[in-house]
Amino acid sequence: LSQTVFSGVATHHGRNQQYLKADLDSGAWPQTQRNNAIDIIRKSMALHINGDQHLTTLSQYGVDKQRDSNWSFCTPAIAAGYPRSWLPDKVGMPHRNRPNHNQDNTGEYLDGCGNKVYVYAVGNPETCVDKNRYTKAHQKASGFGLVTIDIEAKTYKLDCFKFAIDATLPNPDNQFPGWPVVIHQSENRGENRLS
């Protein structure tokens, strides 16, 4: 558990969604210290739960190679203020190995700081046009993250609900694209099953 994600998984910022090559408001830099921290937590096989980015992502860190380290669940903000988006496809960032769901802006990337990161899911905001504060919060990709740990199966079930929904209804559109997801503990040291 920490304040922020250890990768720069935001490419566009602010009300006008301007492109920013490297987001230094993350744990992506300095790279040597970032890699040292990940090397330490990899041994724990822990899911890295974090926030602070106003943008929900599910990603996996790479140090020596793509996907050799812990998964990161950057949960959505309950009331996203400063808008951020992860839109690498829009700016032509090279990628490889999209997940099986083949959603845009997912796959293996080098972030703006040169870190290896596999982005499995992202909850980008919509264009905010509504004056109602609850509708606006929904459009800005506010929401709720839920982690269910199964200690016998050694899995983490990750749910990522949008803001203005009823989570008790089994509607797949209640969650951001790419969720829910189940990750096995051993995947946090690069023994990957999810693709």
Predicted regions span which residues?
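Long, structured stretches of catalytic cores involved in phosphate-ester chemistry, encompassing
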Residues: 1-195
